[in-house]
């Protein structure tokens, strides 16, 4: 059920353009990272507090591997004075409120709405986000240096991505089985779609997405070219013989 929702609801074009646009400048990347920091902090705080039989076992099993807010705080510190210098924007605040509302409803009825939010963000990170670390460094060097962005690094869990994703799918299915009714399962699906809409709002809030994405792509190309120029030059045959 959730897998089909992912395919139908995931606006890959907007996600891709929004991510590319975040590479247009260090300042724009800082704003994007701050938005993700605020979103993940809200989501992980709600997951930490969750007692629903559909949510708590999932987070108990995977929270240590999936948690991103600590890494995002470090990434933000690389490019901004503090998170307080980038408070939540209106779109980010709306997203945070939706997450908190989902957690409150789950607390009331034992539902699994928070699973929908976790599904949206963590699968995006595992399926695509891990491949964005190097492009981010190329585009924004030297402000974003080696070993960063940290929030794309899932350690051993990410290194075994296929097996980890299969375990996550199994856990989500178990969460669905723990829900008491078809209506409760449908509420999770609706929350996934809501989470996607909030992500699109955050990714596009700053505007100029296409031009920002083009600038980000240009920064990436320039960064790759600079990296190649800095590589040690192999000696020509005549030089080696001299």
Stretches found by the model and what they are:
Residues 1-242:
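Metal- and O2-centered redox machinery and metal/ROS homeostasis
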């Amino acid at each position: 059920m959730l897998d089909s929702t992912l395919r139908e609801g995931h606006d890959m074009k907007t996600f891709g353009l929004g991510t590319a646009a975040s590479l247009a400048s260090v300042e724009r990347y800082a704003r994007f990272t701050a938005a993700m920091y605020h979103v993940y902090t809200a989501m992980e705080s709600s997951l930490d507090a969750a007692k629903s039989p559909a949510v708590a076992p999932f987070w108990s099993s995977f929270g240590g591997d999936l948690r991103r807010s600590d890494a995002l705080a470090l990434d933000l510190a690389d490019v901004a004075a503090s998170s307080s210098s980038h408070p939540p924007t209106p779109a980010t605040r709306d997203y945070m409120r939706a997450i908190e509302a989902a957690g409150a409803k789950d607390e009331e009825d034992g539902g699994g709405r928070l699973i929908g939010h976790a599904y949206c963000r963590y699968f995006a990170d595992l399926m695509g986000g891990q491949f964005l670390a190097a492009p981010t460094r190329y585009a924004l060097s030297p402000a974003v240096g080696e070993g960063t962005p940290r929030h794309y690094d899932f350690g051993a869990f990410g290194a075994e991505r296929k097996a980890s994703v299969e375990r996550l799918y199994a856990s989500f299915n178990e969460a669905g089985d723990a829900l008491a009714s078809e209506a409760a399962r449908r509420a999770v699906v609706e929350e996934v779609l809501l989470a996607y809409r909030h992500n699109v709002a955050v990714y596009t809030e700053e505007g100029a997405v296409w031009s920002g994405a083009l600038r980000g792509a240009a920064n990436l190309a320039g960064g790759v070219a600079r990296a190649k120029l800095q590589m040690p030059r192999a000696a020509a045959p005549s030089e080696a013989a001299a």
